Regions:
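A conserved ligand/cofactor-binding region detector
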Residues: 1-815
């Protein structure tokens, strides 16, 4: 288009915002203001704000194109973004302006923000980390984009019915998603099944089933900068919408059967994998993400450069965990089959562009796929994986000619218990960099899981300790504390969290400590009001708020927390008139729908809560609350209110954790094991300002190898014996006394895999130290303030800068 293009740029004044909101409501949403509901007003406000973001977005895109920069493409099955409006207002600095505009229109901004659904694009720490990283990429002006799936229903909505988790569809798109741009012209065919046709040295993948991936783009705003990036999500569509012949014959279900089958790929996050069909759907889902993404990356590169010669110089593809590892054979397939690369050239490029983050060392959590299943669905990719494996093993064999045990250990194909493809092995063999997410995790990674690979490729492995974005997790989630920090050290900590260290001299002043305490109390009152309104439970904000919020999993040891709660309950019952530090134990988190034990733990928590909360002897000395349907928006209310943060995983099991960082940043003290990033947090905040308990990773391993006997702990510790016997005998489930016998057996008789009983006494004794300190409020708040002041290292901005410099080799765009 060569003709001059003019438009009226939307301004940021209050009057302009009012006009824009009214215009959007009437002419985009098509609603009469006199009858519009809150959702419609919210969408109008979102669209008005989005308009003001688009110019920055297009300017960033133009700058990336004109400066011909190297870009990173971040692939993740999850992006747990949280609500968009508050974050956008914060980034643009127009929160007060929009608040005033809506107020003058008779509307309340905070009420409208509560109407926004959390996007159902993730589940736990993996997805939230990806979201923090996108925020930091944009804020630092680094060229990159995220790629994920636009799930129709997210994971699930968690309801608690009779104390048990019940799952229902999380239809987060119920009122639309005005923040996204649907790209009707950006579609790619994704193929499954079929057969291979050999034509000389070339291979054709033919007679495949096809579905279409359509792009949906979301703007990722940088904070206080024109720099913005894109999150591109793929939605599945049938290649043929409807079988008209069958429809006209009256067979209406058969007419749309193919369409529904195709679109199932982007219906839900992590379909239940307890059945073969569920596992197959997961595999299709992972391939759907990577196929559309890699095609898009190559298409964008060709449009910009019209050559493949510089492909490895211009793109970096990062794999967030093993779910997107099929991107490796997909890139090889496209380069060889579609773009006529030789195998060697394709492999060289592939090794140069990929990097991989490992998020777990637990063998049961490392993805493997049966060779038969991949062969059925992705036959071409299976042949490429075999070729990569053969090439790799032959190369290593030249150096270790007779070490067949080594060959078996490092082979991408696991020949034991049925042939399976080890996705983490494939990622490590091909990626030029592999990183862990905390110093402890990265050390364990090269000492245990990838020890053979670390010996072969010592320069390939590195550490990038996780971080969190201070914009969402402090500035947005905790305005009361942010105001205290602003008064003390100014506002620029939002983009340079290391400035929090400037708080240290202020900690000697009682007035500053009092301000920190006042902010905490305001946040506790806010949470207590939310719980009263939504759960009809009364909490005392003067009590110590003891919080464990994360997905429910045995290694995260919510059950250890419950054992302490029961012990505390027993002590109160034994001496109800003593001066107890009042406590509120808060739990939240989802259990995977097929994870029976985790769901059983939720049931136990609620049964224990029911018993304790209704015991007249206990009253306000102890309360237990399980808050359902945990997500980002709930976390933004709960985390600022916490006094004590529970980070109690078995040492050596949590790769990093990020909720530990969020809690400390918001002035909670941590009780935790020396696991994940807790180790580095202790180094930064000081050992005296964190409550560490339990066995270390070497001690855990020593117990395991020497023969751990949990029954010994059960029989020798009277309080532990009492708590476990109460669980087993039905004290908390009198209507079904044997309900939790299996949990008791797992701990006492069947090995206690995560060593709860070994750490119980240390944990309970450390909780007594927590009580002792909480009785000294000034000292408690002083230590909380020291935690805040020393959390600057744990910014996602620092993490992303390290990735940019040492793994991706990308530089900021000049705007």
């Amino acid at each position: 288009m060569n003709a001059p293009f003019t438009y009226a740029s939307p301004t940021l004044t209050v009057d302009a915002l009012k006009h824009s909101i009214a215009y959007k409501l009437m002419f985009t949403i098509g609603k009469d203001p006199s009858i519009a509901n809150k959702h419609e007003w919210l969408n109008a406000a979102l669209l008005a704000v989005r308009d003001r973001m688009v110019e920055r977005w297009l300017r960033s895109s133009r700058a990336q194109l004109s400066q011909d920069v190297r870009q990173v493409y971040y692939l993740s099955m999850e992006f747990l973004m949280g609500r968009t409006l508050g974050n956008a207002l914060l980034a643009m600095g127009i929160y007060d302006d929009l608040n005033q505009a809506l107020d003058e229109m008779g509307l309340d901004l905070s009420e409208l923000m509560e109407e926004e659904n959390d996007p159902g694009l993730g589940n736990g720490g993996l997805g939230r980390l990806a979201a923090c990283f996108l925020d930091s990429l944009a804020t630092l002006g680094l060229p990159g984009r995220g790629y994920g799936i636009r799930y129709d229903y997210g994971m699930f909505k968690q309801n608690i019915v009779d104390g048990q988790q019940r799952e229902s569809p999380d239809y987060w798109l119920e009122y639309g998603n005005p923040w996204e741009f649907q790209r009707f012209n950006t579609r790619y065919k994704v193929r499954f099944g079929g057969r291979l046709q050999h034509e000389g040295s070339r291979v054709r993948w033919v007679e495949t089933e096809e579905i279409v991936a359509m792009a949906y783009d979301q703007i990722i705003p940088g904070f206080d900068t024109d720099a913005t990036n894109t999150l591109r999500l793929w939605g599945a569509q049938a290649s043929n919408e409807i079988n008209l012949g069958k429809f006209n014959q009256g067979d209406y279900f058969a007419a749309v059967e193919d369409k529904n089958h195709s679109e199932n790929v982007s219906r839900v996050l992590y379909p239940d994998d307890s059945t073969y069909s569920g596992r197959e759907l997961r595999l299709r889902q992972e391939y759907f993400l990577v196929s559309a993404t890699v095609q898009d990356i190559l298409n964008r590169h060709w449009q910009m450069h019209e050559t493949w010669d510089n492909l490895a110089d211009k793109i970096a593809i990062h794999l967030n965990d093993t779910h997107p590892v099929l991107a490796i054979p997909e890139l090889m397939r496209l380069l060889i089959d579609e773009h006529k690369f030789t195998w060697d050239d394709a492999f060289e490029v592939t090794c140069q562009v990929f990097s991989y983050t490992n998020h777990t060392l637990m063998s049961e959590a490392l993805e493997t796929w049966p060779v038969d299943m991949i062969g059925k669905i992705l036959q071409r990719h299976l042949s490429i994986i075999f070729e990569i494996n053969d090439y790799f093993l032959k190369t290593i064999q030249d150096y270790y000619p007779d070490d067949w045990d080594l060959m078996a250990r490092i082979s991408i194909i696991d020949e034991n218990d049925g042939r399976r493809i080890r996705m983490a092995w494939l990622a490590v063999v091909v990626s030029h960099k592999v990183n862990g997410v905390s110093e402890l995790h990265s050390n364990l990674m090269v000492q245990s899981l990838f020890a053979d690979f670390a010996r072969l490729f010592p320069g390939r492995f590195c550490n990038k300790t996780n971080g969190v974005t201070p914009r969402r997790w402090l500035a947005l989630a905790n305005p009361a504390l942010s105001e205290v920090l602003d008064d003390a050290i100014g506002r620029t900590w939002r983009t340079d969290l290391a400035q929090l260290s400037e708080l240290v001299p202020h900690i000697d002043y009682p007035a500053f400590i009092e301000q920190i305490a006042d902010a905490k109390f305001a946040n506790k009152k806010r949470l207590a009001e939310w719980v009263a309104k939504n759960m009809d439970i009364v909490l005392d904000p003067q009590a110590l708020f003891d919080v464990q919020i994360k997905r429910i999993h045995e290694y995260k040891r919510q059950l250890l927390n419950v054992l302490h709660v029961i012990t505390r309950y027993n002590r109160i019952k034994a001496d109800p008139t003593a001066e107890w530090v009042p406590r509120v134990n808060i739990f939240a988190g989802k259990a995977a729908s097929a994870y029976y034990v985790a769901k059983h733990i939720i049931h136990l928590i609620n049964d224990v809560a029911n018993e304790i909360n209704n015991d007249p002897q206990v009253k306000n000395k102890l309360k237990v609350v399980f808050i359902p349907n945990y997500g980002v928006s709930l976390a933004q209310i709960i985390i600022p209110a916490a006094d004590l943060s529970e980070q109690i995983s078995t040492a050596g099991t949590e790769a990093s954790g990020t909720s530990n960082m969020k809690f400390a940043l918001n002035g909670a003290l941590t009780i935790g094991t020396l696991d994940g990033a807790n180790v580095e947090m202790r180094e930064h905040v000081g050992a005296e300002n964190i409550f560490i308990f339990g066995n270390t990773t070497p001690q855990v391993e020593k117990l395991r190898t020497e023969g751990y006997n949990p029954r010994k702990y059960y029989e020798e510790d009277a309080e532990l014996h009492q708590a476990l016997t109460q669980i087993a005998s039905g004290v908390f489930s009198p209507q079904e006394p044997g309900r939790y016998r299996n949990l008791f057996d797992a701990l006492v008789n069947f090995g206690d895999h995560y060593q709860l009983l070994a750490d119980y006494r240390s944990y309970v004794d450390t909780q007594d130290k927590v009580d002792k300190l909480y009785r000294q409020p000034e000292e408690w708040q002083r230590r909380a303030a020291l935690n805040i002041a020393n959390m600057g290292y744990f910014s996602a901005d620092r993490t992303i800068q390290e990735y940019a410099d040492e793994i991706w080799h990308i530089s900021p765009v000049r705007l």
